[in-house]
């Protein structure tokens, strides 16, 4: 009985799927959640992009492709190609992820309360497709320290973005 139960796992609330027990126990493997919205996700996304955008994971700090990008242009949602951030609003917060103080236009990003990991944070998502971008933090003193127009830091996963040069 225990062997049979070990060959199943919960992938989302109320959904159970069968897994290969020979590979399911490997710690480096991550399994994507299966959702009813699967068909709405860009088929060209990498596994890492799917984990970040759809399953709300966070890429490792200091590993993102756009962390040190200084080119002029616009950052778009990697899933739906919606413009989200202008390069002029990007700044170096030294947090390990690209940081922006303002979205490209009001309403491009949606804000949601996130109480995961025992912390109260605000999650930011693409308003068009709902893809997870990262989190927003306020009141950290960036306005005074760097002379930014806003004291807001959008901490964004590079995996959730595509960059288009001007």
What are these regions (language model features)?
Residues 31-166:
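A short Gly-Trp-Pro
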């Amino acid at each position: 009985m225990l062997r049979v139960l070990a060959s199943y796992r919960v992938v989302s609330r109320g959904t159970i799927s069968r897994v290969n027990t020979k590979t399911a126990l490997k710690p480096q493997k991550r399994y994507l959640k299966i959702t009813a919205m699967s068909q709405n996700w860009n088929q060209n996304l990498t596994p890492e992009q799917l984990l970040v955008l759809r399953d709300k994971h966070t890429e490792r700090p200091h590993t993102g492709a756009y962390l040190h990008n200084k080119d002029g242009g616009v950052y778009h949602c990697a899933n739906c190609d919606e413009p989200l951030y202008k390069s002029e609003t990007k700044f170096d917060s030294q947090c390990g992820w690209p940081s922006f103080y303002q979205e490209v236009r009001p309403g491009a990003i949606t804000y949601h309360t996130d109480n995961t990991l025992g912390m109260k944070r605000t999650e930011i998502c693409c308003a068009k497709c709902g893809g997870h971008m990262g989190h927003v933090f306020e009141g950290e003193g960036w306005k005074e320290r760097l002379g930014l127009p806003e004291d807001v830091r959008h901490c964004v996963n590079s995996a959730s973005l595509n960059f288009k040069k001007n």
